[in-house]
């Protein structure tokens, strides 16, 4: 969500901070700001809207400094205004903040009683005033921050500077991701390593509760008041490949990158048509013990988990439950022994999923219940990867568009690989079936490429959606979650109200919405549910609805009046959800472009949801 960039160097870092913010734009935001210290003054610029507005203001004001912090804000407390934009100041202190201070109103009341005047509606300004107040009692900035941190309740990351400390940047991680970029004669902080790749590829990943002091030449990290060392990790240069290239939008680029992303993801697990011997080898003992699976995820990742539930139960006979993380953690779930808890997250930092994981681990430990945890994630250095027993990476590369595409399909591929591995370990799937599915996985990128050849057809269909206000997506079996995903994509980026339903539920309510203004998107693979799905299509047409059908070549579904059909290549039934993701992604993309919305950064949304 919000993005932090900060640094301390020997050179002017204003442009570095602005460039860092530009590289964080994909996370979603509504305002941006920067503060630099120069000659014991805080020089600050803040603007509503795009980072480009801030960059123009900085260029005009010509502010500069070798110590500074910058921020993109996604509003949680207070509207998107210049006064609410970060950095916030109090006296000689400037602060940027990601996350939520849950007890900010109580702290604000106390500070107002002391005479502090608030100029914003944010929870962040509380932190600036608290540190300023603590400086009257402490001898240095680090000690003042240490005094304030225990007063803050919530999940947050902080970057703090002070005019009396022109070579010192203090940072705090408590429930919100933060990374230190290690340079030569300069050091930086950010919410995301991608922001710092132009200046360094060496990083230190802060852990929960860490407080760090950065100078030009040193990094000190403290955990629970004790000075500690955290390892410096060098990032593969390929991770920085995050430009749009020849594509108009990141989303379109990432849709077209899916065949290669699937190829990369399966290559880590398959040797020919068999699982590699070293694939998840260290997890085999845990896999042998599991009797149940619980998947925890949010948004698009939740839809991937829904599909995996069908696969777990139908392929290897392991009971599987799937829950939205924000619901799971607050309902006091029963922790069941010998359960594999799977967290799915593109970033590995999704706040609700991470909190659900930690709560589950805490409950299991308190009751001495044996469980295992595993993350499916696209970021090898993320909190979830570090905090689970095992992990399986989706090798999708950076995904910049807010609407997930290649992360989703690689999650599906990774989940299938995981299921094959668990089934093999537990001897609940035949070697012949593993070989068959492995063969189809290798073939999947080719089918995806062939499906992408229908882009022009889908563009023509999208023109019929531009003036619509509502839309239904219908599917059965593993394509019900794809219907949900298609509806999510359309509403995310085109702002058309869309709903996904299991087609069998049509008569239980949604059919009342169907009229000649309601487009209905149907996912119709050639499987054992096709005949029932065709009956649902007839029900829609009988009520005047207009059908947009994605079906495979052997389905027998053909064009007719008010029934538009895109025929895509036939694919193995187990893997059809991966392929059928592409047409709903392309449809949503083209509708959004035709409606003139911001495809890569849709309003009110963030790529990485790091607050609850």
Curated annotation (Swiss-Prot):
Entry EC no(s): 2.6.1.16
Residues of the SIS domain: 283-428, 461-602
List of catalytic residues: 2, 607
Record field: catalytic activity: D-fructose 6-phosphate + L-glutamine = D-glucosamine 6-phosphate + L-glutamate
BP terms from Gene Ontology: carbohydrate metabolic process; fructose 6-phosphate metabolic process; protein N-linked glycosylation; UDP-N-acetylglucosamine metabolic process
One GO MF term: carbohydrate derivative binding
GO CC annotations on file: cytosol
InterPro entries to which the protein is assigned, alphabetical: GATase_2_dom, GFAT, GFAT_N, GlmS/AgaS_SIS, GlmS/FrlB_SIS, Ntn_hydrolases_N, SIS_dom, SIS_dom_sf
Lineage top rank: taxon: Bacteria
Enzyme class of the recorded protein, top EC level: transferase
Alphabetized Gene3D superfamilies for the sequence: Glucose-6-phosphate isomerase like protein, domain 1, Glutamine Phosphoribosylpyrophosphate, subunit 1, domain 1
Compartments, as annotated in UniProt: Cytoplasm
Domain Glutamine amidotransferase type-2 span(s) in chain numbering: 2-217
UniProtKB keywords: Aminotransferase, Cytoplasm, Glutamine amidotransferase, Repeat, Transferase
Keyword Repeat: yes
Alphabetized NCBIfam families for the sequence: glmS, PRK00331.1
Record note on quaternary structure: Homodimer.
Function: Catalyzes the first step in hexosamine metabolism, converting fructose-6P into glucosamine-6P using glutamine as a nitrogen source.
Protein name: Glutamine--fructose-6-phosphate aminotransferase [isomerizing]
């Amino acid at each position: 969500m919000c993005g932090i960039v900060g640094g301390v160097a020997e050179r002017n870092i204003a442009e570095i901070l602005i460039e860092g913010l530009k590289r964080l734009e994909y996370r979603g935001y509504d305002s941006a700001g920067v503060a630099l210290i120069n000659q014991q003054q805080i020089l600050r610029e803040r603007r509503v809207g795009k980072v480009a507005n801030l960059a123009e203001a900085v260029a005009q004001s010509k502010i500069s400094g070798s110590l500074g912090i910058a921020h993109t804000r996604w509003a949680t407390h207070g509207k998107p205004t210049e006064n609410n934009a970060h950095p916030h100041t109090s006296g000689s202190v400037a602060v940027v903040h990601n996350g939520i201070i849950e007890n900010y109103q109580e702290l604000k009341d106390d500070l107002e009683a002391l005479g502090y005047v608030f100029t914003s509606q944010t929870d962040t300004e509380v932190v600036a005033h608290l540190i300023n107040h603590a400086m009257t009692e402490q001898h240095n900035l680090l000690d003042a921050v240490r005094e304030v941190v225990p007063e803050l309740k919530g999940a947050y990351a902080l970057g703090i500077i002070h005019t009396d400390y022109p070579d010192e940047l203090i940072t705090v991680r408590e429930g919100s991701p933060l990374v230190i970029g290690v340079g030569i004669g300069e050091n930086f902080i950010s919410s995301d390593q991608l922001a710092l790749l132009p200046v360094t590829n060496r990083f230190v990943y802060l852990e929960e509760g860490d407080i760090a002091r950065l100078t030009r030449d040193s990094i000190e990290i403290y955990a629970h008041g004790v000075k500690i060392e955290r390892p410096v990790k060098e990032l593969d240069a390929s991770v920085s490949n995050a430009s749009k290239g020849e594509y108009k939008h990141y989303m379109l680029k990432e849709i077209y990158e899916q065949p290669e992303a699937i190829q990369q993801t399966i290559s880590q697990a398959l040797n020919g048509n068999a699982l590699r011997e070293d694939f998840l080898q260290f997890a085999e003992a845990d896999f042998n013990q599991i009797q149940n699976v619980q998947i925890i995820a949010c948004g698009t990742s939740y839809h991937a988990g829904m599909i995996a539930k069908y696969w777990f139960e139908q392929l290897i006979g392991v009971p599987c439950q799937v829950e939205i993380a924000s619901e799971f953690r607050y309902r006091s779930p029963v922790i069941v022994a010998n359960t594999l808890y799977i967290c799915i997250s593109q970033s590995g930092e999704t706040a609700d999923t991470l909190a659900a994981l930690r709560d589950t681990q805490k409950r299991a430990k308190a009751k001495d219940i044996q469980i295992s945890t595993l993350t499916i994630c696209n970021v090898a250095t993320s909190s979830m990867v570090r905090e689970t027993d095992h992990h399986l990476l989706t090798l999708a590369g950076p995904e910049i568009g807010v609407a997930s595409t290649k992360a989703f399909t690689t999650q599906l591929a990774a989940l299938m690989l995981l299921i094959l591995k668990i089934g093999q370990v537990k001897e609940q799937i035949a070697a012949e079936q593993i070989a068959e599915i492995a063969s189809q996985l290798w073939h999947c990128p080719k089918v995806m490429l062939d499906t992408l050849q229908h882009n022009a057809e889908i563009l023509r269909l999208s023109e019929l959606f531009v003036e619509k206000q509502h839309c239904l997506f219908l599917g059965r079996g593993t394509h019900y979650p794809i219907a949900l995903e298609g509806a999510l994509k359309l509403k995310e980026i085109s702002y058309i109200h869309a709903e996904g339903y299991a087609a069998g539920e049509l008569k239980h309510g949604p059919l009342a919405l169907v009229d000649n203004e309601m487009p209905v998107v149907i996912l119709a693979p050639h499987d054992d549910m096709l005949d029932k799905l065709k009956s649902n299509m007839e029900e829609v047409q009988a009520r005047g609805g207009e059908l947009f059908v994605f079906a495979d070549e052997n389905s027998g579904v053909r064009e007719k009046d008010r029934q538009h059909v895109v025929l895509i290549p036939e694919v193995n039934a187990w893997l059809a959800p991966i392929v059928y993701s592409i047409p709903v992604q392309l449809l949503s993309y083209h509708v959004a472009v035709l409606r003139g919305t911001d495809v890569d950064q849709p309003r009110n949304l963030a790529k990485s949801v790091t607050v609850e």
